[in-house]
Amino acid sequence: MKILLIGYGAMNQRVARLAEEKGHEIVGVIEPTPRATTPYQQYQHIADVKDADVAIDFSNPNLLFPLLDEEFHLPLVVATTGEKEKLLNKLDELSQNMPVFFSANMSYGVHALTKILAAAVPLLDDFDIELTEAHHNKKVDAPSGTLEKLYDVIVSLKENVTPVYDRHELNEKRQPQDIGIHSIRGGTIVGEHEVLFAGTDETIQITHRAQSKDIFANGAIQAAERLVNKPNGFYTFDNL
């Protein structure tokens, strides 16, 4: 499989290493500005790369959105987070002409977490729910795209839900419809996501901890391996 990388930060550097270990080839990199330290051919536009089988994106909205407005037809794996609604609308449009895969978290374990959460929410309908995510001190966006995904699962199953990001100015007791959302940034934490169900005299916690960023890179590669054989359409872990 010949892979074009969109962005060449820490994540796509891992994708390159792991993909080559699997026998795949990196045919180029798209970066906002050329860098002498990038060990692959650099491009400005997706359409300039003629021999790629798939593109894998671990970048940011500033780089990705202008590229998505260009004319190209290439299977696309997208892991960028930020401006989610705008991104999903654009990817849905592109999926009419190419296979597109998107996940806010490329770990299959996190996908499993969403399924566990979907089963737990109806069973624990009268429990309070608090969501917490923790990441390294270099992560810019908060809350994480993954936590937003977990929140979306809850919203799809409960009525009149209210996200609460900060309680220090509320000066009132917790309301039944509140969903607490908390972000922690520090050190080199790869990624942790926890769902707390708090009931009367008991609590239940569901936690996913990433031990290495390799799980995200491998997840993107595995998605790409499947996507190249798919017809045009919008894919997630649910239908890939």
UniProtKB/Swiss-Prot annotation:
- Recorded catalytic activity of this chain's protein: (S)-2,3,4,5-tetrahydrodipicolinate + NAD(+) + H2O = (2S,4S)-4-hydroxy-2,3,4,5-tetrahydrodipicolinate + NADH + H(+); (S)-2,3,4,5-tetrahydrodipicolinate + NADP(+) + H2O = (2S,4S)-4-hydroxy-2,3,4,5-tetrahydrodipicolinate + NADPH + H(+)
Give the GO molecular function terms: 4-hydroxy-tetrahydrodipicolinate reductase; NAD binding; NADP binding; oxidoreductase activity, acting on CH or CH2 groups, NAD or NADP as acceptor
Where's it found, cell-wise? Cytoplasm
Q: Where, in this chain's numbering, is (S)-2,3,4,5-tetrahydrodipicolinate bound?
A: 136, 145-146
Task: State the superkingdom.
Answer: Bacteria
Q: Name one GO biological process term.
A: diaminopimelate biosynthetic process
Q: Which residues bind NAD(+)?
A: 79-81, 103-106
What metabolic or biological pathway is this protein involved in? Amino-acid biosynthesis; L-lysine biosynthesis via DAP pathway; (S)-tetrahydrodipicolinate from L-aspartate: step 4/4
Reported EC number(s) for this entry are 1.17.1.8
Q: Which UniProt keywords apply?
A: Amino-acid biosynthesis, Cytoplasm, Diaminopimelate biosynthesis, Lysine biosynthesis, NAD, NADP, Oxidoreductase
Active site at which residues?
135, 139
Would you tell me the Gene Ontology cellular component terms? Answer: cytosol
PANTHER family on file: 4-HYDROXY-TETRAHYDRODIPICOLINATE REDUCTASE, DIHYDRODIPICOLINATE REDUCTASE
Family of the protein in this entry: Belongs to the DapB family.
What job does the chain carry out? Catalyzes the conversion of 4-hydroxy-tetrahydrodipicolinate (HTPA) to tetrahydrodipicolinate.
Can you name this protein?
4-hydroxy-tetrahydrodipicolinate reductase
Its source organism is: Staphylococcus aureus (strain bovine RF122 / ET3-1)
